[in-house]
């Protein structure tokens, strides 16, 4: 329970207020985490409402299974499986989808999960430690080119090539030093390469973010779930997404803008704009944590919440 108590759900009231438009509707929490949003949604639902939550983390599933509410069910899988998982339950349309992206505080704060450079632990970084390739396993085989691309594209790290070369050089010493399999050593290697410091940021921040995103396929899964949410939302249904870094937010912003804009019409063609299909989404708002929330929970500082509504059947 300690981690659950320490974890503070970001933009809790604002997200649920924006999401729940019909108390008797069917809602999806794509990232259960420690259940802050899910519990708040359930508190707003009528007896006929339903909430289906998703999470890859076995510990999140354990927490979810303690919720004794007939209106609630949990799916141990990525939110990228949302379309198929709901179809298997006979659900074709939902009243709202909530996505709280990124890694949760309990995951970061547990050195055994391998997400943090602040405490030494096994180099894992998987949201679900029972599935897929760990960070250490990927680092043991990735080429300089692949490492460079991941660290550059997912970490927006300008020293990506130098870090990649240092990681491959360390791998060449595995017979003498053993495998690179701890967060502490990874952070140390990056720190030797990245000499400049961003204010308030550890030199390893961008590299750890990049490797975590790659290992968990976070951006690919995000694109899949956005497409699924668009097709699942009923008319008037809401899509609410909380992002914590620019890569995620850029994808969400572009997705919402693309589906809230009417298609361009070539003036040379005999087509009137009014004759074209209406865009399926309407952008409702963009919100940020209040100053008071950031003071109480510094990890909320980088959060941005975007809300869109389905306006076509």
UniProtKB/Swiss-Prot annotation:
GO molecular function term, any single one:
rRNA (cytosine-N4-)-methyltransferase activity
Q: Might you report a single GO cellular component term?
A: cytoplasm
Q: Which residues bind S-adenosyl-L-methionine?
A: 35-37, 55, 79, 100, 107
InterPro entries in UniProt: RsmH, SAM-dep_MeTrfase_MraW_recog, SAM-dependent_MTases_sf
Instruction: Provide the catalytic activity annotation.
Output: cytidine(1402) in 16S rRNA + S-adenosyl-L-methionine = N(4)-methylcytidine(1402) in 16S rRNA + S-adenosyl-L-homocysteine + H(+)
Q: Which Pfam families match?
A: Methyltransf_5
Query: In Gene Ontology terms, what is a biological process of this protein?
Result: rRNA base methylation
Q: Where, subcellularly, is it found?
A: Cytoplasm
Entry EC no(s): 2.1.1.199
Instruction: Please provide the record's keywords in A-Z order.
Output: Cytoplasm, Methyltransferase, rRNA processing, S-adenosyl-L-methionine, Transferase
Which family does the UniProt entry place this protein in? Belongs to the methyltransferase superfamily. RsmH family.
Q: What does this protein do?
A: Specifically methylates the N4 position of cytidine in position 1402 (C1402) of 16S rRNA.
Name listed for the protein in its UniProt record: Ribosomal RNA small subunit methyltransferase H
Q: Which organism is it from?
A: Burkholderia ambifaria (strain ATCC BAA-244 / DSM 16087 / CCUG 44356 / LMG 19182 / AMMD) (Burkholderia cepacia (strain AMMD))
């Amino acid at each position: 329970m300690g981690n659950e108590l320490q974890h503070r759900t970001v933009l809790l009231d604002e997200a649920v207020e924006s999401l729940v438009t019909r108390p008797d509707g069917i809602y999806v929490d794509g990232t259960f985490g420690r259940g802050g949003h899910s519990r708040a949604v359930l508190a707003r639902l009528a007896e006929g409402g339903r909430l289906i939550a998703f999470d890859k983390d076995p510990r999140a599933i354990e927490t979810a299974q303690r919720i004794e509410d007939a209106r609630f069910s949990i799916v141990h899988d990525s939110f990228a499986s949302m379309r198929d998982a709901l179809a298997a339950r006979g659900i074709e349309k939902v009243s709202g989808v909530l996505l709280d992206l990124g890694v949760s505080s309990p995951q970061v704060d547990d050195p055994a999960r391998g997400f943090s450079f602040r405490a030494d632990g096994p180099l894992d970084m998987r949201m679900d430690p029972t599935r897929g390739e760990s960070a250490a396993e990927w680092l043991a085989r990735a080429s300089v080119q692949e490492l460079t691309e991941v660290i550059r594209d997912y970490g927006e790290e300008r020293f990506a090539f130098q870090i990649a070369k240092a990681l491959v050089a360390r791998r060449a010493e595995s017979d003498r030093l053993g495998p690179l399999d701890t967060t502490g050593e990874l952070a140390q290697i990056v720190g030797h390469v990245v000499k400049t410091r961003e204010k308030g940021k550890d030199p390893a921040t961008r590299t750890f973010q990049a490797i975590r995103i790659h290992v968990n396929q976070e951006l690919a899964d995000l694109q899949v779930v956005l497409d699924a949410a668009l097709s699942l939302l009923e008319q008037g249904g809401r899509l609410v997404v909380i992002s914590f870094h620019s890569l995620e937010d850029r994808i969400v912003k572009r997705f919402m803008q693309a589906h809230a804009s009417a298609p361009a019409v070539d003036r040379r063609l005999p087509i009137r704009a009014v004759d074209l299909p209406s865009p399926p989404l309407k952008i409702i708002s963009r919100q940020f944590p209040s100053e008071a929330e950031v003071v109480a929970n510094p990890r909320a500082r980088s959060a941005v919440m975007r809300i869109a509504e389905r306006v076509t059947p």
